[in-house]
Amino acid sequence: MVKRSRRRGAAQWATVRAKAGRTATDENEDDLGSPPSPGDSSYYQDQVDEFHEARSRAVLAKGWNEVESGEEDDDEEEEVLPLNIDDENDEDGESSEEEEDGEDDDGGSSVQSEAEASVDPSLSWGQRKRLYYDTDYGSKSRGRQSQQEVEEEEREEEEEAQVIQRRLTQALQEDDFGVAWVEAFAKPVPQVDEAETRVVKDLAKVSVKEKLKMLRKESPELLELIEDLKVKLTEVKDELEPLIQLVEKGVIPPGKGSQYLKTKYNLYLNYCANISFYLILKARRVPAHGHPVIERLVTYRNLINKLSVVDQKLSSEIRHLLTAKEGAGKKDLNPKAKLTKTKPKSAKQTDVNADLTEEPEFDEAALEFYKEMEDRPELKRKKEENSAEEQALEEQNAKRAITYQIAKNRGLTPRRKKIDRNPRVKHREKFRRAKIRRRGQVREVRREEQRYSGELSGIRAGVKKSIKLK
């Protein structure tokens, strides 16, 4: 192949020189006759440019098939201006060079073959450079393949990548996960003897104020979490547990209200449990900074803060439920008993509650019912005002009604006290005032039922009622 390429290059160069020799005189005459026109190629190119252009045209005319076949040859560059040397001399030189190379490589061929035999065939390099080119990323190779072949190649590539990844993972060692490379860039820290810098403090001799100061400096969130734990446990015990009992007994029907109470109850319990775990870490002197419990506490606190908006809206209803439970129990929670103001029999109490929960108007939580009960007086007042206005509009053309003064017709009757209207109450009040006056005039007899045990109201040591002698 090398000989053929050299012959082809020599022949082309000889043809160009022959053409250049034949046309040199003609071109000189043309140049002397008239200058080249701008449309002529000689106006822009010389002989060397024309040679390269003709060569590129010939290559394009032959097509890419011959170019690809030429790439399969050994990586020998084709000479542009080769020397016109006989082929026999070239063959002799090549044979001598091959013999010299063979003599040089005989010593290392055995060692190289042994090294190649010890390598896994799947990890060894190929023998030809062309195997590593013309991948499936180009449009040319994909165009001649079907969709099924392309998918098969992609699947094989994926499997091969997984095999390589598993092999690399198995090759990892413990040193690969260390931070030795970071320690190399770290600044050397001067080592100080702990016995010289450590100050031993006797906490028994430290005052409470100093202890609190040290505690706030070390972990400022500890005291706040303790106070928050006390508040949340008190709220769970006094408010949420009674309401959860009402939900379990069916007094508060299932709905959004009961779901809200259960959510808040579980949220508070989880928050208190995480605070308790944090306190255990502090008691065991375990560093809590960066511990997952800190992130968990922040999450629960954010959720509790989101519930504060709903707590403000339902605070009055919750207080009403708690007072009703502490006072009259389930009887006060029965809406039909409040509307009719009658005392149903105890045997029918459960039936009434069951009917109320089954009716569609009581599908919502009991909290909404008490909200309606609070709004009832205002609705009644508005209804009365509307009825009064309607009555006034209807009686605009009627006669004017008499006033209270005309209806009573008291005239010049003197004003009397209200107590004079009822003689029994009047004499009772008169007797009460007489007893008070009698107690101030005559001392009541107090018989000695037991021995003297001192003044009942106590003796004031600072009081002096004696008169000094003059």
Swiss-Prot record:
Q: Cite the InterPro entries for this sequence.
A: Sas10/Utp3/C1D (IPR007146), Sas10_C_dom (IPR018972)
Per the record, the covalent cross-link Glycyl lysine isopeptide (Lys-Gly) (interchain with G-Cter in SUMO2) lies at K140
Chain intervals for the UniProt region annotation (Disordered): 1-47, 62-162, 329-357, 375-457
- Composition bias (Acidic residues) maps to 68-107, 149-161
Q: How is it modified after translation?
A: Citrullinated by PADI4.
Q: Where is the composition biased (Basic and acidic residues)?
A: 375-386, 441-452
Point out residues bearing the modification Omega-N-methylarginine. Answer: R8
Q: Which GO terms describe its biological process?
A: brain development; chromatin organization; maturation of SSU-rRNA from tricistronic rRNA transcript (SSU-rRNA, 5.8S rRNA, LSU-rRNA); ribosomal small subunit biogenesis
User: What subcellular compartments does it reside in?
Assistant: Nucleus, Nucleolus
Q: Where is the composition biased (Basic residues)?
A: 413-440
Where are the Phosphoserine modifications? S37, S146
One GO cellular component term of this record is: nucleus
Q: Which UniProt keywords apply?
A: Acetylation, Chromatin regulator, Citrullination, Developmental protein, Isopeptide bond, Methylation, Nucleus, Phosphoprotein, Ubl conjugation
List every position bearing Citrulline: R376
**Family of the protein in this entry:** Belongs to the SAS10 family.
Function description: Essential for gene silencing: has a role in the structure of silenced chromatin. Plays a role in the developing brain. Part of the small subunit (SSU) processome, first precursor of the small eukaryotic ribosomal subunit. During the assembly of the SSU processome in the nucleolus, many ribosome biogenesis factors, an RNA chaperone and ribosomal proteins associate with the nascent pre-rRNA and work in concert to generate RNA folding, modifications, rearrangements and cleavage as well as targeted degradation of pre-ribosomal RNA by the RNA exosome.
- UniProt subunit comment: Part of the small subunit (SSU) processome, composed of more than 70 proteins and the RNA chaperone small nucleolar RNA (snoRNA) U3.
| Alphabetized PANTHER family for the sequence | SOMETHING ABOUT SILENCING PROTEIN 10, SOMETHING ABOUT SILENCING PROTEIN 10-RELATED
What this protein is called in its record is Something about silencing protein 10
Origin organism is Rattus norvegicus
Which gene is annotated as encoding this protein in its UniProt record? Utp3
